[in-house]
Amino acid sequence: MRYTHRHARLHEEEEKIVTSTVPPVRVAAVPAAHPYVIAVADPAHVRLLADPQPPGVPAGQWWPPQVLLPAWLKAHAADFDLVHVHFGIESYSPRELAETVETLSALGLPLVYTVHDLENPQLVSQDDHRASLAVLAAGADALITLTGTAADEVREIAHRAPTVIPHPTLLADAARPRGTASDVTRVGVHLRDLRPNIDGVGTTATLVRAVADLRAQGARVEAVVRMNERVRDAEAAASIDLLARDAEGVTVERGERLDDDALARWIADLDACLLPYRHGTQSGWAELCHDLAVPVVSTRVGHIAAQHPTDFHSFDVGEPVSLARAIVDATGPAWSAPGSTAREAEVEHRAVERRAELDAVRAAHVALYRRVIAAEAAA
C-alpha cells in the first residue's frame, strides 16, 4: 500500500501543528537513546532528555530506567513536559509502575505510552508484562501503537482507542545497500543471541527441510543461519549447528553482533529474510527489510503481517512445505534479487516514500504531545 493512501490521516495531524515559535516539547522518553525514539522525535519541535545513568551500571546503559522512579520524577519535574514510555517496563513490577502513574498524576504531568510489545520478546512468562501493560494502558493520557490490528488488541485491554502511528524508517538519509548479485536464491535467518522469543531450533529444522525440498525440485537455493557468538541458550545453539552440519545448501555463521551498517549489508545480500519469532508483536527487522526491498518470510505471530502486507509471506514452524512455498512466493518479484537494477529502483522508490512518511510520523507525535499537554493544563 503506497504512502498517499496509508498516511493521509497523519497529514491531517501535521496541519494542526503550531508554528516553530512555540518552545519545543521536552520529553522524558524511556529510553531516549533508542534509534526508534530518536527517529520519531522531530528535532525542530521535540527535545529529548538524556537517559539518566542508573547507579552501578556500565556507562551508556539506560536500564533500569530511572525516569520511571517516583523519586526521579519528583526531583526533575521542572525539567520535562511529559513522559513517553516505549521500552524497559520489565525492569519494574506492576505495583511499581502504578506508583509511577500515580506520581505523574499528582505532579500534573502527562504520560504517553507506545505499546510496542503486547508480548515482551525478552521474557518467557508474559504474566507480569501483561499486568504492567494494563497498568500503563489504564493510566496513560495517550496511547500509541504501530498497526491497526495491534490497535484492536490494545483497545480490548485499555477499553479506549490508541492512536495508530506507523513505524518509520530508521535509515533516514543513510546509505541503503542494494546487495550483491548472485546466481542462486539466498535465504537468510538471523537468530541473534537466541533470546526467548527466537525459535532457533524449530526455524532451522524447518528451513533445512524446505531447502532440501526446493533443491530436490531443481531450485538453486541456499540458506544461511546466523547467530551471535555469545548466545543466551548454548544448548539450542549446539542443536542448530547439528541440524545444519550435513544439510546441503545450508550454512551456519557465528560471529560478533553486527552493527547497524553491517546488518543492513547482510540483509541486502538476501533474496528473502526469514524472521524466526515464536512470539512477538511488531518487528523493527521487518521495517529494515522493507527499506532494503528484501521480502519477509515469517510465522504469523503478533502483528508483523500488518506492517507491510505485500512484503510478508507466512509459514508454519514444523511445516517445510509451507516454508518452501513462502520462499518461492517471496522471491518471485524481480526486485527481490540483490544487486539487480530492479532492486536498486525499488529501494530508491521506497526511500522517497519513507522520507515523506518520517515527516508525517514526527508531525503526528508532536500533535499528540501538544494535545495531552493542553488537556492537562485545562484539567
Residues of each region from the PLM?
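Donor nucleotide-sugar binding/catalytic pocket of nucleotide-sugar-dependent glycosyltransferases
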Residues: 138-175, 186
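Short beta-strand->alpha-helix junction loop in the catalytic core
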Residues: 164-175, 193-195, 230, 366
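Conserved catalytic-core segment of nucleotide-activated headgroup transferases in glycan assembly
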Residues: 182-242
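Nucleotide-activated donor-binding/catalytic signature segment of Leloir-type glycosyltransferases, i.e.
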Residues: 236-265, 272
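Acidic donor-binding loop of glycosyltransferase active sites
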Residues: 265-281, 291-294
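Short hydrophobic beta-strand element within catalytic cores of glycosyltransferases
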Residues: 295-300
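A charged, aromatic-enriched C-terminal amphipathic alpha-helix characteristic of glycosyltransferases
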Residues: 318, 332-379
